Each structure stands twice: as C-alpha cells, then as structure tokens.
Amino acid sequence: MTFPPSPVDTDMEPTRPSRRRWLWIVSGTLAIVVAAVSLGVAALQLGLPWQMGENDRNHVYEGAAGSQRYQVHLPPQHDGTARLPVVMAIHGCAMTGYGWNSMKSTTQFNSLADREGFIVVYPTQLISRNVIACWNSADPRHQQRHTGEPALLAGVAREVVQKYDADPARVHVAGASSGAGTAVILGVTYPDVFATVTSVAGGEYGLNQVDPDNPDATPPLDTARQGWAQMGDRARRVPLLVIQGEQDEVVPPLVGTRLVAHWTAVNDLVDDGLPNDSLDPTTKTMSVPGAAGRHAYTRTEITAPDGSSIVEAYRVQDMGHAWPGPDGDGKYTDHAGPDASAIMWEFAERNPMS
C-alpha cells in the first residue's frame, strides 16, 4: 500500500528560502547594523542637530594633509563692525570637539565668548585617525609643519580667519591632555599662526622621546632645541600658559614642570640662538589658599624685562587629570579648581601677536 505525500512534505519545500535569498537577508541585516553603528559613532563624535546653537556652524577643512571637521561658535559681537579674536580649543583622549564628552561642554567657552567677544573653534578627532580619539601628539609624523595634524589645524585656523574676517594677530590655541600636546606642537610649527598656547595637563614638544623611568636622560633643553629648530625663520617668542594638577596620574606633575623649563628654554633660544639666559627673565610666584571647597594653587609668572609673558603656570593642589572650572560639564572636569577658561582668555587677551 502506498500513501500520498503528506501536506507537510508538499507545503514546506516550496516555501523554504533559497541560499541566495538567505544571503540577501543576512547582507541586508548586516548593512542595517553597520549603518546604525556608523550613525551612532557619528552622533557621539559630531553631536546631534539639536545640540547646535543658533550661532554654531559646522565645517570641513580640506587641505593637502587631508580633511578636518570642526565647529565654530560666533558670539553676538560678530556683526561686521570689528575683527574678532579666535580661540581654538583642542580636546583630549576619549573626548570630542562638539559631540559626546566634548571640549565645548568641558570648557564652556561659548558662554565666555558671548560675554567677551571672541570666536571659538572646536576641531574634533575621528576614530579613523585614532581609535580612542586622541590627537597624535606623540607621533613624530604629527610634529612638523606642512604635515599631519599640525597642518590640518593650522589650515582650520586660517580658514576661520578668512571665512569670518577674524583678527589674524589674535588667534590662540588651547588644549587638554593629548590636545595640549598638539597645542604645544602648533606653537613651534606655526608660530606665525598662533599668538599664544595654553596647555592643560599636557607636555613639551617631543615628549615621546622622554623615558618616564629615566626622564633626566633627556633634559628639557634637548627637546627645546628641537622645538626651536621647528620654528625656523618664523621663530618668535610665543607666550605659554600651563595648568597642571598635582594629583594627575595620567600626566604626572613632573611633565608640567618639564614643560615650563622646556618652553623657557625655547624662548631663550629664540632670543639669540644660545641657551644662555639672555632674556634675563623674572620669576614671581604667588600662592592662593583653598577655601569653601576650592582647591589651593600656586601661580608662577616668568616674564621678560619688558614685562611681556614667557610662561605662566598654575599648579593646582588635589586636582587630577581634568580641566578645572566651576561650570564645566564632562568626564574630565574639576569644579573645585580655578576657572581655566577665564584664565586662558585673560592670558590670551593681553598677549596678541606682535
């Protein structure tokens, strides 16, 4: 006796997807996942549309060294009646310029800019260049003029001056952590672009050459000679502001101490090409005690005989790896520290490029 095919047998075979169809389904699903991840990464790095203010502008600089995304904040004073100063703020590792955990929210420069009347520029690093969004200040390929990140960021600064008719003699750069290292690099590779440099939790030019276990083997003068050489025929005294936490375990206080000595030596070499203290600098230090939940700190000013700034340094007690200030919003802020953003702007305002 024979039996006809069961309904199950006859119905299942024709409806089973072919191998090609399964490949289409899997490929399509993967494409959706990749697109979603890409959008998520973009949102983290570049922010969301509603995070932009009315006076914020997003741009992409294109140059010989590649492309660079950045956001500009225009203060109310940008009305065509005067050429405004520019502050470029460079974020640290695991941060962005204007997305998640941003330099914009950490520094609160926009509010200060609206009061004081300067343009703010926030470049942002992409994970395609560094997987944790650090600026590559420890890589020699990004420590020279006309190449790498220095060329990109100097190009951004020049583009902002041109686009927004800003004052080229008052373009300043500030950075945090790896961004501070990049800011210092810009000070020696593009002294003709940046009037002052501010380093918060950063180190000297060529810090990657210094052995953390034997730092004395590479004195700050050695790296200072390299920094001065990078300046070339554009060499000039570039004022530097240094802010360093005494409890910083990422960038130890010794790195900040070396940076002050390094930059003083760079300026000494600029004067006559010799490490001979020809500038005859004056050093003054004052201590500010902690009170009402605020960190104590010391402020050291190193000035030339004419009173012009060489280095100004803040050492903040009980502060770790952070940008200090009362209003900062981010993973690397310290509300008990002095107001780094206000200090930076006051320093920049009295030190235009001469």
Where are these regions (language model features)?
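Active-site glycine-rich loops that stabilize anionic/oxyanionic intermediates
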Residues: 84, 92-95, 319
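A conserved short beta-strand
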Residues: 193-208
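Alpha/beta-hydrolase active-site loop
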Residues: 141-164, 185
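Cap/lid segment of the alpha/beta-hydrolase catalytic domain
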Residues: 122-148, 210
